[in-house]
Amino acid sequence: MNRARLQLASLWLLLTVTLQAVASAMGTTEREMDVKALIRVTPLQAEESGGVGQGNLTLEGLFARVAEISPAEGRLLQFHPLSLCNTSEDDQTKPGFISIVKLETPDRDTQPCLSLANKARLAGERGAHAVLFDITNDRGALQQLQQPAGINQPVVLIWGPDAEKLMDVVNKNKEALVKIEVQEQPKWLHHDIWILLTVAGTVMFFVLYAVARLLCRQPPPQDSIQQQTLLAISRLGTRRYQQRMLKDQRASGGWVETASTSSSVPVCAICLEEFTDGQELRILPCCHEYHLGCVDPWLRQNHTCPLCMYDILDSGTPPRPLAHRAPSQTQLWGRYPGSARLMSHLPPHGTPMVFPTPNNSLFLPRAPYYLDHTHHWQMPEQMAMQMRTHRRGAEGTRELGISPGCQDSSGYLPDDPGSDSSSGPCHGSSSENCTDISLHCLHGTSSSSVHSSQSNQEDSSPPALASYLLPQGELPALNPLLSTQASYASHVHFHQHRHHHYRRNQPSMSHSHPHRSKRRTKVSRADPSYYREHRHTTGANGELRSLMVRREPRPSCSRTCFDPRTNREHPRHQQSMPQAASVVQGSSEPDVATSLRGSRTDPPSRTYRKKKSSAPSHLPLLYSPRHCHPANSVQMSESSHPRWAEEVRLLHSRVNSHRENTAMMHLYHPPHHNQGATEEIEAVCEHAV
């Protein structure tokens, strides 16, 4: 308001100055509009006393409006002011002269006999062609002679230096001829006047318009804004802070966190004090929370959020609900930040909120399910070859769903393909240190979310399904139809040094997952049939090999054996041994390594091809060390087929040696881990020794 008053005062001062300038210009113009007279004085007799003769004089005067404006000519003759009061006819003068009258100060002549207009008329009656008034001592005579009086003789007013020069000629009793002429007015004088008046009028118009606008412009009443602010504050939500209840709801995963409760220690952004139980909190439309006594005074003055400057009076932008969030922000699940998915088509305003997972006790299972381009499930055997071609390009997305406490639940982060193991956490250490790290990071059930690139690309298994490749409704960990007990992850651990290599067992049909392998039961060391012994052998190249043998009790033989070709079980004594032998010899039976390894689509490794040449090419179908290990099966083979007995005995000893070689690996990993093929374990053991 003070600023408006200052502007109004400035405009009023400008208007006053403009009006004064216009008035002065108009007065000057009026004076200039008075007709000027040129008085030419020509002496009749020159002085012969030796002085310098005076020449002609040209003086300027002003025609008075009391008489007509016309030129005149005559001899110069002086009259006293009092002589013009006498109307007697005693003083006779020749007509045709020009009278000059020097006026005295008004103090001396307080009561003049006649007015100046009457004196000029009287001089004209006496024969004067014109009257000259010297008004040097009486400047008021100019105003007296401005009123027209109908005098026929011109009246000229003269003052200043020009009047002194003319009186000097009279005082020396010199005769002179005076000629009065009318001076021509300049033609551009009227144009200048109109230009000045136009500019002055324009300035005055704008000044008046600005003043009227300031007077008509009224600020909005402060009461209406205050009422709107109070109404908006009354509509805002409040809640009572309860810290214990908040912790319970966070633990159960049933609390939707806001911007202030997402921190471990929620504080008020205004007073910077922590929220305590029982305090009233004000919830703004932007999901920010403050103390009721801290934010209400701020809202009454500014009606905006202190953090995000959201205007609570802004009706154009609707307040964002709690369930919405900006599309560029990631929605995190409550306990596992790695399990995330992007939300879209949400309002852009507000603060992100965190939603808990429906079941925080489950990890995403690392089952070998895959999605093709048509979003259909495929078996790992079908996707193995496809994933190998894109293995090197997809190395940057191998790791998802890792908890922040231990990024790799199976042990350590894998190295890139072709890099040395010293770049990883082991830094060139032995297999024991890597195994210790692997065992140190296990959480309950061994769940591995990392499938590193292996040293042998042909022996690599397809990586586990990333959580972002699965549809939302098809996530096994979030599907309520799946059994929670069956959702577990197997431990698959690889290392660049090829120190140890674990593979899944032969896939078994399970009700929870068709590609999960059953775990082998851990044999108690207190069992009398369980013992270990150390053996020292010398290899073909002269190197010493130290093996530790673990004897386990053989399970009781069932009456059926598993056929790897048909994936079915059949009774052992349906036919005699010679018939079985003929069937085996006539069919294209895979080798022992293929039977032991199970159904695999990966090509055999280089170490396996070397061992394959020394293994027997044909074995009885009924002998499968992985599925059925009866002691009497070998004896029956010896009695019926001696040739088979020798081969089976060699293979049985070879399998036992493979089992013995795995004893060193059990020192570093407990028996509950999934075991790999015996040939691959032997190759790894050779490399380690």
Curated annotation (Swiss-Prot):
Disulfide bonds: 85-113
Zinc finger (RING-type): 268-308
Keyword check for Phosphoprotein: no
Enzyme class: transferase
Keywords from the UniProt entry: Cell membrane, Developmental protein, Disulfide bond, Endoplasmic reticulum, Glycoprotein, Membrane, Metal-binding, Nucleus, Signal, Transferase, Transmembrane, Transmembrane helix, Ubl conjugation pathway, Wnt signaling pathway, Zinc, Zinc-finger
Region of interest: Disordered: 386-430, 445-467, 492-639
Glycosylation sites (chain numbering): 56, 86
Compartments, as annotated in UniProt: Cell membrane; Endoplasmic reticulum membrane; Nucleus envelope
Record SMART domains: RING
Family note: Belongs to the ZNRF3 family.
Protein's UniProt name: E3 ubiquitin-protein ligase RNF43
Taxonomy of the source species: Eukaryota, Metazoa, Chordata, Craniata, Vertebrata
